[in-house]
Amino acid sequence: MRRYTVYGGSFDPVHCGHMSLVERAVALDYEVIMVPTFRHAFGKQSAPFEHRVRMCELALQACQLVEHARVCTIERSLAPASGAPVYTYDVLCHLRAQLGSAPCLLVGPDISAEWERWYRHTEIDQEFGRLCLPLTHMIRSTDIRQRLRAGEAPTSLSDVIPEPVAAYIAAHGLYR
């Protein structure tokens, strides 16, 4: 029976730190389902959803993880018309029904530090569990966006974002 873990995030943009978590979960014999947020639960504004989904797909291809990881756009179909956010608990419940087993939630220590703010965090722990992996790359999407807005060329950031993601950012003029 396959073991699944769900890795949700803004992925704005996806970077090598994100991919390191995916690689390590795969090494632990999990199939990783990356779920970009459609509407952030804490109101954070992001690049358009379709761009973030495509960047995640490119990152998985670049890191040769497509056999063990995939991008899932379930948040778009679950998003209420009211503009309310989609909560992780609801995503996990829907994926459990689709997969036939309960996936655990892949998180880094940054999420663990704010875990009690999350909607139905106790139920997530009880029904799904968390796979908490330490960060090996101290990279923040916020810092990447700031560097790009300051005029740094996306291709100069290949140490922190996969090259196809950098090329995509440049081609679409994101984060200017």
Residue ranges: model-predicted function:
Residues M1-R176:
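Nucleotidyltransferase catalytic core that binds NTPs
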